[in-house]
A protein has these predicted regions:
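A residue-level marker of the well-folded mature domains of exported/periplasmic proteins
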Residues: 27-322
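Short, aromatic- and cysteine-enriched interfacial helices/patches
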Residues: 8, 25-27
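N-terminal hydrophobic targeting signals that begin at the initiator methionine
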Residues: 1-2, 24
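Bacterial N-terminal signal peptides that target proteins for export
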Residues: 2-11
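C-terminal motif of bacterial Sec signal peptides marking the signal peptidase cleavage site
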Residues: 18-22
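Prokaryotic Sec-type signal peptides and long signal-anchor helices
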Residues: 11-12, 209
Length: 323
């Protein structure tokens, strides 16, 4: 069993990483995105830059990156990577943590605090921040806003960024399909069929599974929250009780991985490398490298080359695969 698991860890190291490099913010336009923010959607370039020494960067986080794994953690790793790449000081990074993305007032307050503290560009990292970010972008045209996931933008001072995560999702499905013995694979999903980000990942994962194991079935449990430790734990527990012997996830905590390890079955992590959390269960993880985009976006504000275009990078831009 250890030899088989080692093989799949090597496979994971080779292929399961969504690492998006940035030759420029406008280098990776979403083929399907439309400007659906508030106001005029004509794409324009920023007229002047901001000095590297004076720029301030705000980031709105859904949870606390100190948790050490998962969605917010990997975004903050990206922010720290950008900070190092550009030589910014700690005082130039303004973080707002544990901002509930379903609470528009809390979102607005966090963004306004970043503006009041002098931020030139603000990254709002969760889907639910979208509409409030769009509104704030119209109210503060001299500040740049970049929303992670979602679909709204205005082609001026407000864009959206994401990546083709369906690509490594497909590859992780291959790993799952080759490892299941019961032909039951569990998927803990943050949102249901109304959310294209989640359903696109499930579809890609399923296609990967079926490419190597057409007899396998995938069971999905929805938590209806991007971050809900109790709900994620309950969903994973239900899937394990259904005799699923591989568990994967599109949610923020490591509970699905930890429960899989407790049940002595396999798991596939998401967002960050979750093998450190469940080393005996986690075959591989679908990992984001956000620092590439964050570096390019902030650099464009410094240089005065921001043009409001959307970003949708893919695995063809990987400089190096890692888990």
């Amino acid at each position: 069993m250890k030899r088989i698991k080692s093989f799949f860890k090597i496979l994971g190291m080779l292929v399961l990483c969504a690492s998006f490099t940035g030759c420029g913010v406008n280098g990776n336009i979403d083929d399907y995105a439309v400007n659906t923010g508030y106001g005029d959607s004509d794409t324009v370039k920023s007229s002047s830059g901001v000095s590297r020494d004076s720029i301030k960067v705000g980031v709105i986080h859904l949870s606390d990156p100190a948790e050490g794994s998962g969605y917010t953690y990997t975004h903050d790793i990206g922010i720290m990577g950008m900070q190092q790449n550009l030589g910014l000081s700690d005082s130039q990074i303004i973080r707002k943590i544990n901002v509930n993305d379903s609470d528009k007032e809390a979102t607005r307050k966090a963004i306004k605090e970043c503006i009041d503290e002098g931020c030139n560009i603000i990254f709002s990292t969760s889907w639910g921040y979208m509409e409030t970010t769009a509104q704030m972008a119209e109210e503060y045209p001299d500040v740049y806003f970049s929303h992670g996931t979602g679909y709204m933008s205005n082609g001026k001072n407000f864009n959206n960024y994401f990546g083709r995560i369906y690509q490594p999702r497909y590859l992780s499905g291959i790993v799952a399909g080759m490892n299941t013995k019961t032909n039951k694979i569990g998927y803990v999903a943050a949102m249901g069929s109304e959310n294209s980000e989640v359903t696109g990942g499930i579809d890609a994962f399923a296609l990967g599974v079926y490419s190597v194991n057409p007899s396998a079935q995938i069971y999905v449990k929805v938590t209806n929250s991007w971050y809900d430790p109790a709900a994620e734990k309950a969903a994973a527990s239900t899937l394990l009780d259904m005799n699923c012997d591989v568990i994967t996830q599109h949610c923020d905590t490591t509970y699905p991985q930890l429960l899989a390890q407790q049940k002595n079955v396999y798991s596939i992590g998401y967002n960050s490398d979750m093998s450190k959390d469940a080393p005996d269960a986690c075959l591989c993880s679908v990992i984001w490298n956000w620092s590439a985009y964050y570096t390019a976006a902030v650099q464009s504000v410094i240089d005065g080359t921001w043009d409001g275009s959307n970003y949708y990078g893919g695995m063809n831009e990987i400089g190096r695969a890692h888990v």
